Amino acid sequence: MTHDKNCPCGSQKSYQDCCQALHLGLDSGAQLATSPEQLMRSRYCAFVLKNFDYIIKTHHAAYLDGLTLEQLQQGPHPEWLGLDVLSANDTTQPDGSKFGTVTFKAWYKMNGEIDAIYERSEFIFEQGRWFYTKGHQMHAKLPGRNDPCVCHSGKKFKQCCMKG
């Protein structure tokens, strides 16, 4: 990814000014996500860039359910179209533990069909950083023909991703 392209997470910043620092700084602890939303956006970006090591390392080990780096590398690998964050929050419990949720739609195309992962993701803050734990899937409705395109091009859906 070149510096002149916007980060896939939808922030409207360049990748270098956005998720790259999180992707490169995770192992050293130099740069960690400061909120569930930032972690979720950086994980979406990692899926787009096929940085599956980041996906595994930001997924809480107790919730992997057998998911491996090899499985992620094998695919399937859709063409990611865009991310819509619908809501995000985090709370601190009286005992000091932190939890968060992010509801989003991650639009993709696979085998010529457009669909979305529509999920309410759950996160936990442990060992000084946020981890993804699990997600609750919901059904995503495709936009109408005259609605804005899911890829955030500024075009109508019928003039953009719906065409091809």
Swiss-Prot record:
Family per similarity comment: Belongs to the UPF0225 family.
Name of the molecule in the record: UPF0225 protein Shewmr4_2054
A matching Pfam family: SEC-C
Leader sequence segment: none
Gene3D superfamilies registered for this protein in UniProt: 3.10.450.50
Lineage: superkingdom: Bacteria
